[in-house]
């Protein structure tokens, strides 16, 4: 019996053991192409089936070493269903490739307005799904449960890359799949549900626009307004082809200040934001009209500037398309950007068009509150103890740029937070065809701003370099020559350029070369976001200086007692140190 037990123990001890897989390398968001093949179990990459989507892999709260997989806002055949959430899936790692473990089907319930409740079973195909580097390929077999004995297959395939947290999600507006139905907001209805308006003949009978014209680039909000049951609804933005190629268009966003179709002297400003636009007006007192932006996107980067391409045009005096009193050929366009943290709140902000008093809401993250700009509507404004506007810019764009796009770089001002470790948690950017914070009565009808290729820049450089108090400039090849001088670290001074940049210095004692590597905050996703400087010092002099310094440190004055004996260290009382009497 004892022999059998020993053999069993030996077998158990010899069985392979596996370390728990670290899930952090795959945790995060991924964006890319989603292919949905309804009625078939075959995964196909047909461009007619392609749509933009995001998926998320998160560490499971219920089990260490496992992940939750989610595909938000899943839809097919034009029907918006909801989220596919597949929890607690094991992860395996081998040679840099992460695969997913076996996972059971999850029963999902989707409530739709089109066809009522839909039941579906879904899982992650563990035999084919994987993450490698920053790429993910996910196979998701879905079954539409029409009855327990009849289930329609839906093959869902996602191919994407990790979301760059330091960049804007949709910056060039080229993908036609990423132009979507806009969802205007007001204080009475919240975000508009287009399904309730689709067949509303009264609404579209009073509106001068069609539903398909209310579109916006994904991740941005164009400031279309809905009016009152269609009355006064106004479209102020649209895709704009910059290359004239219908087969392969290069899209930008065109924002236009547009008169209300029923009140041509009331011009709706055209702007877009990463947050949510809102407008408010009382038909009986149009002087109380107001609007703007609230909210933004979650963001923890510290960009140094915003770069974008633009063109600008003005309606000129004498143009008969618009009333003379709403033409403003000198109006500037505006770009506004700000990074902040904490909560900003304002009570009783009106946010709809009504005959008398518009309804109000408590508004969070209103741009004027964050930027400390006076508001003309709304109640008391407060903020949390940790709230701070960390960086900002309000830039006017003057003149005309027509027939082409020009590139402009707009620096962000970090003010007192420059060079600090204070981190933002939110970002908003606003592009406006008008003087955004100017008088509403001065908004110029027909004035337009075209915006494309919006990028966040992260600097990675050094400036104001000096050695031994003497300023110097690096050459075009980022080198400097101090080959006649010894390298003493304390003698080199410079200033880092880049709010989120990091600096590394390494010195080669054999060659006398000091290498300074400056990495931009986005270097993880942008390998070009790095600058390397080298300084040549005299290796021999540096070595000699080091030896002398070491020797000087080793030679200390001898210590003797008053009786003439040499001591290892001074004692209490009288000592003879370096030939002088010292009392301790």
Task: List the predicted regions and their residue ranges.
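Bacterial Sec-dependent N-terminal signal peptides
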Residues: 1-25
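Aromatic (Trp/Tyr/Phe) and Gly/Pro-enriched flexible surface segments
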Residues: 162-307, 328-458
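Edge beta-strand at a domain terminus
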Residues: 20-29, 36, 51, 83-95, ...
């Amino acid at each position: 019996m004892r022999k059998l037990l020993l053999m069993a123990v030996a077998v158990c001890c010899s069985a392979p053991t596996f370390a728990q897989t670290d899930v952090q390398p795959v945790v995060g968001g991924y964006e890319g192409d989603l292919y949905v093949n309804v009625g078939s179990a075959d995964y196909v990459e047909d461009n007619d089936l392609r749509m933009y989507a995001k998926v998320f892999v998160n560490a499971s709260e219920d089990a260490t070493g496992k992940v939750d997989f989610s595909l938000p806002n899943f839809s097919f055949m034009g029907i918006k269903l909801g989220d596919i959430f597949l929890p607690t899936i094991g992860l395996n790692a081998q040679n840099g490739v992460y695969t997913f473990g076996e996972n059971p089907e999850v029963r999902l319930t989707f409530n739709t307005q089109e066809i009522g409740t839909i039941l579906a079973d879904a899982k992650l195909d563990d035999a084919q799904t994987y993450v490698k580097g920053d790429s993910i390929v996910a196979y998701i077999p879905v079954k539409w449960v029409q009855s327990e004995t009849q289930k329609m297959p839906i093959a869902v395939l996602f191919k994407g890359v990790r979301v760059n947290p330091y960049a804007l999600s949709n910056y060039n507006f080229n993908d036609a799949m990423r132009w979507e139905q806009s969802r205007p907001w007001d204080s009475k209805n919240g975000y508009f549900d287009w399904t309730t308006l689709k067949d509303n003949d009264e609404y579209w009978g009073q509106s001068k626009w069609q539903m398909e014209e209310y579109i916006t680039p994904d991740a941005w909000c164009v400031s279309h307004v809905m009016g009152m049951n269609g009355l006064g609804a106004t479209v102020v933005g649209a895709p704009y082809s910059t290359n004239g190629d219908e087969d392969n268009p290069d899209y930008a966003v065109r924002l236009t200040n547009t008169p209300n179709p029923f009140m041509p002297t009331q011009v709706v400003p055209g702007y877009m934001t990463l947050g949510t636009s809102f407008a408010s007006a009382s038909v009986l007192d149009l002087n109380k009209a107001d609007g703007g932006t609230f909210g933004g996107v979650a963001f923890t980067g510290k960009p140094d500037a915003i770069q974008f391409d633009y063109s600008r045009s003005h309606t000129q005096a004498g143009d008969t398309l618009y009333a003379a009193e709403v033409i403003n050929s000198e109006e500037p366009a505006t770009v506004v950007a700000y990074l902040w943290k904490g909560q900003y709140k304002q009570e009783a902000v009106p946010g709809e068009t009504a005959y008398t008093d518009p309804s109000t809401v408590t508004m969070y993250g209103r741009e004027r509150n964050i930027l400390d700009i006076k508001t003309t509507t709304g109640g008391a404004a407060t903020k949390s103890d940790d709230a701070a506007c960390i960086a900002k810019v309000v830039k006017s764009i003057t003149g005309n740029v027509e027939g082409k796009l020009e590139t402009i770089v707009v620096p962000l001002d970090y003010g007192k937070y420059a060079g600090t470790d204070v981190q933002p948690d939110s970002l908003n950017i606003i592009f406006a065809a008008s003087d955004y914070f100017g008088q509403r009565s001065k908004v110029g009808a027909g004035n337009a701003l075209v915006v494309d290729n919006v990028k966040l820049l992260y600097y990675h450089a050094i400036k104001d370099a000096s050695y031994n108090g003497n300023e110097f400039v690096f050459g075009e090849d980022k080198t400097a020559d101090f080959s006649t001088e010894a390298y003493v670290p304390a003698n080199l001074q410079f200033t880092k350029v880049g709010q989120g940049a990091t600096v590394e210095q390494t010195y080669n004692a054999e060659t006398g070369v000091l290498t300074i590597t400056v990495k931009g905050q986005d270097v993880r996703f942008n390998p070009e976001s790095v600058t390397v400087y080298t300084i040549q010092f005299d290796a021999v002099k540096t070595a000699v200086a080091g030896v002398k310094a070491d020797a000087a440190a080793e030679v200390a004055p001898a210590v003797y007692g008053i009786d003439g004996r040499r001591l290892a260290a001074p004692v209490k009382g009288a000592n003879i140190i370096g030939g002088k009497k010292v009392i301790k």
